[in-house]
């Protein structure tokens, strides 16, 4: 068992097992842990091993090769037939041979399942409080504090500080927004972290200066044709239409749709104003985090459950250190080699898959699962699956579902608590408390701001400024790491290129002649089979760009506006949901007589009116495009089958990619076979575009196998979302009949 850990240590002398007295504190999953020594692979025998050269990290489990793994790419330890290869530079990345990992482009991606807007979080918090009050359960109530009356001088000083931090926040937000907007206009892709920062900054700007809605938004709409003309890289390069008018309309439609979606996201990011709020949420969170970090005082279970909801998956994963990311990947049997962005991306996709599975399992019931299904579900969530009884499997899975779905604890916190060195005897609240202690300080700042926004309280400008500056520093650090990787890769490639291009020397002279001094009988021959299939899966960034261009070309040939119509319908649903959430909040507050204290911000009201106007304009553009296409440009056969306008055959995709640029036949077959999940010879273009946009937003390198897994995850989320919509519709109809 010890060899599983010790074989991957960094060669710092012979390792030995430490005595139990030398064990590190429980839950020590920090930068000092040597997480390259952890091997959390299957789940049979559980032991904690400590070597001389590192501190303890993950628990270690044995693994049987006969057990199927639900992982992104099976590690070489799990499959004996997979060839090993060294790291090789490719473009500006370091990649591992085998399934190759490629960066692709895109801007928007599908929203993760269950990702709530700010108003939805406020509504859930309000419903939870009212429900506990009706049931007579425990409701968190802050201790009564003695109000100290401030002197006149102290009040003036506080006001001066408030305006100072407010103007400083406004200036910094303006600079960051201008820089990111310039990057967008010049065709650069914002990462997920940058887009989230840009969205929050725009919401802050409209909150600080509501008058900007009358100036900025109409100015942006007026300049759309100019922007499209001056910055052609803002849109995909393949708008190869025969009609200049149709091309102009499509570009205008695309930009208006993106702008309307962004403005709606900005509206949902703005918090409601609660005039009755006393600013207790920020103080309560600060006191809670001070207890678990400094004083050592144990918070109540209600406090732990209440504040744990604020540490969302995206916030937690974006701020974890690399050792913690590697530990989580090994716990979930994911690839632990790659950039931080790649590790976060595959963790995000796994958490999205687990979230969808949790809802499906909860609907069917844990008791309906077989033993193998229980083991697979527990193993996928980082829990013990082998060597335990069926009752324990059901018990720990039910506890997981209760914490995740009923108490709404983020999946990332639950997974992180299982990656730590914690005994099974600890209660869920104590496990969450120990997990929160390991999170970086920046996560606490973000959660503190979110706590005030959810309660509808006025966010302190100083706290908002600190969170913005910390997030900007993290973004700049990512850029520096990216530039450093690119420079190192270019430095490794440059000597090889210079040697291969020496003037006056033929290529044959570059290699010295080898003298055969070894007898033929002593020459060792490698009899292992050569795995040619791995080479066929190598896909470059250029080939992915060609795939994106081919999709655009095929959609143009089919005159398909399916994606635009679908996005417009989703935008209309978001607007309607926002309006319904506002009404529900007022309805919940009417139970306590506080509905008069809540109101929508001025900037939010103005933006909502502008989005409604843009939706009408987009409807008109789509109608105009359809009319243009029906005037002799659309094939009658295609017009008679609207259901298949987004479905193409594998041969059509291969033919379109060949027309753009020559690609080897085996690569085309490998790529299309990975995209054709059900092997029926057909591919949905819209689903393919969603995958490309999703990966492009993360700026990571993935393999063809992972493309198929992303498609499966998106389909699973769509299935769960359809069930939830049908359930909500049935509940609304039942409520209407009852009333």
UniProtKB/Swiss-Prot annotation:
It is found in: Mitochondrion inner membrane. Residues 115-207 are mitochondrial intermembrane. The modification N6-acetyllysine is found at residue 596. The chain crosses the membrane at residues 208-228. Residues 229-739 are mitochondrial matrix. One of its GO terms (cellular component) is mitochondrial inner membrane. Residues 251-536 form the Letm1 RBD domain. Residues 663-698 form the EF-hand domain. Keywords: Acetylation, Antiport, Calcium, Calcium transport, Coiled coil, Ion transport, Membrane, Metal-binding, Mitochondrion, Mitochondrion inner membrane, Phosphoprotein, Potassium, Potassium transport, Transit peptide, Transmembrane, Transmembrane helix, Transport. It catalyses: Ca(2+)(in) + 2 H(+)(out) = Ca(2+)(out) + 2 H(+)(in); K(+)(in) + H(+)(out) = K(+)(out) + H(+)(in). Inhibited by ruthenium red or its derivative Ru360. Its main location: mitochondrion. GO terms for biological process: calcium export from the mitochondrion; calcium ion transport; cristae formation; inner mitochondrial membrane organization; mitochondrial calcium ion homeostasis; mitochondrial calcium ion transmembrane transport; mitochondrial potassium ion transmembrane transport; mitochondrion organization. GO terms for molecular function: calcium:proton antiporter activity; metal ion binding; ribosome binding. Residues 115-135, 445-492, 537-626, 707-738 form a coiled coil. PINK1-mediated phosphorylation at Thr-191, positively regulates its mitochondrial calcium transport activity. Ubiquitous. Residues 1-114 form a transit peptide. Pfam families: LETM1_RBD (PF07766). It is a single-pass membrane protein. It comes from the Eukaryota. The keyword Protein transport does not apply. Homohexamer. Interacts with BCS1L. Interacts with GHITM. Plays an important role in maintenance of mitochondrial morphology and in mediating either calcium or potassium/proton antiport. Mediates proton-dependent calcium efflux from mitochondrion. Also functions as an electroneutral mitochondrial proton/potassium exchanger. Crucial for the maintenance of mitochondrial tubular networks and for the assembly of the supercomplexes of the respiratory chain. Required for the maintenance of the tubular shape and cristae organization. Essential for early embryonic development. This is Mitochondrial proton/calcium exchanger protein. It comes from Rattus norvegicus.
């Amino acid at each position: 068992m010890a060899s599983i850990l010790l074989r991957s240590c960094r060669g710092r002398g012979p390792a030995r097992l430490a005595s139990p007295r030398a064990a590190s504190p429980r839950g020590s999953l920090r930068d000092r842990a040597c997480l390259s020594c952890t091997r959390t692979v299957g789940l049979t025998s559980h032991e904690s091993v400590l070597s001389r050269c590192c501190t303890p990290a993950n628990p270690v489990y044995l693994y049987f090769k006969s057990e199927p793994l639900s992982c992104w790419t099976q590690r070489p330890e799990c499959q004996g037939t997979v060839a090993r290869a060294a790291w090789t530079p490719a473009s500006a990345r370091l990649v591992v041979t085998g399934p190759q990992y490629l960066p692709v482009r895109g801007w928007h991606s599908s929203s993760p399942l269950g990702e709530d807007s700010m108003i939805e979080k406020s509504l859930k918090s309000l419903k939870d409080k009212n429900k506990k009050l009706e049931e007579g359960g425990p409701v968190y109530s802050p201790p009564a504090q003695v109000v100290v009356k401030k002197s006149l001088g102290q009040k003036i000083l506080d006001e001066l500080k408030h305006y100072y931090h407010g103007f400083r926040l406004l200036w910094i937000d303006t600079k960051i927004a201008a820089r990111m907007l310039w990057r967008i206009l010049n065709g650069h892709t914002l990462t997920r972290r940058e887009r989230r920062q840009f969205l929050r900054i725009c919401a802050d700007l409209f909150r600080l200066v509501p008058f900007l809605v009358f100036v900025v938004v109409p100015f942006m709409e007026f300049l759309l044709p100019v922007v499209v003309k001056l910055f052609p890289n803002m849109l995909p390069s393949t708008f190869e239409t025969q009609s200049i008018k149709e091309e102009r309309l499509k570009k205008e439609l695309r930009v208006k749709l993106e702008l309307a979606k962004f403005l709606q996201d900005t509206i949902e990011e703005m918090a409601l104003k609660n005039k009755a709020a006393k600013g207790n949420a920020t103080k309560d969170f600060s006191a809670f985090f001070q207890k678990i970090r400094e004083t050592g005082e144990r918070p109540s279970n209600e406090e732990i459950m209440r504040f744990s909801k604020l540490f969302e998956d995206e916030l937690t994963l974006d701020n974890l250190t690399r050792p913690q990311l590697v530990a989580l990947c090994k716990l979930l049997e994911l690839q632990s080699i790659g950039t931080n962005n790649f590790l976060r991306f595959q963790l995000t996709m796994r958490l999205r898959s687990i979230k969808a599975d949790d809802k499906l399992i909860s609907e069917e019931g844990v008791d309906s699962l077989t033993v193998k299904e229980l083991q697979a579900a527990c193993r996928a969530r980082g829990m013990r699956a082998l060597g335990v009884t069926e009752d324990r499997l059901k018990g720990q899975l039910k506890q997981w579902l209760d914490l995740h779905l009923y108490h709404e604890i983020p999946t990332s916190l639950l997974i992180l608590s299982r990656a730590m060195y914690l005994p099974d005897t600890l209660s869920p609240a104590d496990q969450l408390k120990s997990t929160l202690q390991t999170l970086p300080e920046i996560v606490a700042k973000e959660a503190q701001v979110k706590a005030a926004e959810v309660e509808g309280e006025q966010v302190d400008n100083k706290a908002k400024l600190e969170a913005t500056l910390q997030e900007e520093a993290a973004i700049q650090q990512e850029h520096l790491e990216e530039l450093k990787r690119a420079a190192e890769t270019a430095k490794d490639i440059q000597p090889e290129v210079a040697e291969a291009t020496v003037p006056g020397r033929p290529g044959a002279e570059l290699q010295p002649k080898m003298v055969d001094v070894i007898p033929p009988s002593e020459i060792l021959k490698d009899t292992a089979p050569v795995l040619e299939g791995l080479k066929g899966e190598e896909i470059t960034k250029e080939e992915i760009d060609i795939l994106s261009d081919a999709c655009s070309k095929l959609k143009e040939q089919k005159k398909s506006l399916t994606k635009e119509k679908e996005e417009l319908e989703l935008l209309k649903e978001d607007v309607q949901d926002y309006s319904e959430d506002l009404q529900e909040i007022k309805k919940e507050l009417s139970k306590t007589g506080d509905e008069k204290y809540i109101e929508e911000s001025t900037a939010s009201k103005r933006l909502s009116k502008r989005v409604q106007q843009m939706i009408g304009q987009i409807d008109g553009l789509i109608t105009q495009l359809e009319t243009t296409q029906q005037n002799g440009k659309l094939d009658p056969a295609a017009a008679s089958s609207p259901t298949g306008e987004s479905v193409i055959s594998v041969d059509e995709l291969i033919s379109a990619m060949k027309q753009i640029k020559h690609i080897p036949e085996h690569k085309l077959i490998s790529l299309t076979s990975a995209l054709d999940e059900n092997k029926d010879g057909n591919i949905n273009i819209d689903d393919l575009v969603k995958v490309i946009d999703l990966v492009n937003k993360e700026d990571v390198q993935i393999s063809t196998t992972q493309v198929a897994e992303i498609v499966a995850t998106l389909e699973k989320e769509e299935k769960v979302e359809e069930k939830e919509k049908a359930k909500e519709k049935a509940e609304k109809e039942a409520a209407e009949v009852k009333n």
